[in-house]
Amino acid sequence: MTQLAAARTNPSIIMVVGVGGAGGNAVNHMWNLGIKGVDFMVCNTDQQALDKSPVELKVRLGSEGLGAGNDPENGRKAAIESLDVVRQRFEASGTKMVFITAGMGGGTGTGAAPVVAKIAQEAGILTVAVVTKPFAFEREQKMAQAEKGIMELKKYVDSLIVIPNEKLLEGMDKPLTMRESFALADDILKTGVKSISDLIVEEGYINLDFADVSTIMKGAGYAHLAIGHGSGKDKAKEAANAVIASPLLETSIAGAKRLLINITMSEDILSSDVDNATKMITDKAADNVEFIFGTAFKEDMQDEMTITVIAAGFDEETDDSEEAEEPAAEEAAAPEEPEAQPQPQPQPQQTQAAANGGKKPADPDDLMAIFEILDRK
């Protein structure tokens, strides 16, 4: 079945919200890149961090502005204190999709991100979180806080992508300083969010729009993000294998019932290259996988292919005996997370967005850092 993509009449339906220090740094990085078609907001308990941010839309969580002291409970209470302000920001923007990015394990990101997500969910906004877990050299207490925060956050988002910081170091060919390690983590948060938002806001030969992304990510639970790059004769195989291997995440494509595939390539790429790459990826997913794909040409790419994949719709084991604490006791209980169980199909079902006159996308060269990590694996 083929769906035709609606014309993009409002490119600013996406808001990226950075919560806490790491989330704010990722959003600052995206802002400085001049990304179009996306609104940005930073939320923090630290007034100094907000003052340093170039982002125009800022929300101080709580009344003191002195930070959360690495205590998620302080971050949670500060966010609850600012519920109305955050809600008003969402309502005024007309946002249909919110990305929440944060580093889990500290005070503000861990405690406040679930509150912000709950506000977005209650407003009927498609809510996706992209968060990091601490490095191994950080305290065990911080990892425990991160795990608890992730479980709480998962209750209030449609899709959750978790990036373990430790995975970032596995592909490096030299030791990194602590400053370099955290800068790399911030860049990966930015890359994860931007790779998804680009699918909607960038123009391509076969476009993907908000409805396409919503089909894959709404009510999906844990999701998987992978980016692969290939060049030369075996570019399709190289790019697809990089996506399948995906060293950056703890999840994988295996068992996914929903796939969103976006391919950026040079104009001389053969249709068979696209077919081969797509088949390699879908073969690793569930037998009844539903997939949507888009393509874009980039004129300065020479015999190259870049593939971005979002995989979702995994079978997850749930434990109803442990209920996470409500992030906002003053608020009504959040609706139960929808089951990510698409109806089985006899074979993979492909949904395409409509062609858009061969318009070329904006330059995605800022993703090359992650390609270098992937290529080293």
Where are these regions (language model features)?
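Tubulin/FtsZ superfamily GTPase core signature
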Residues: 1-377
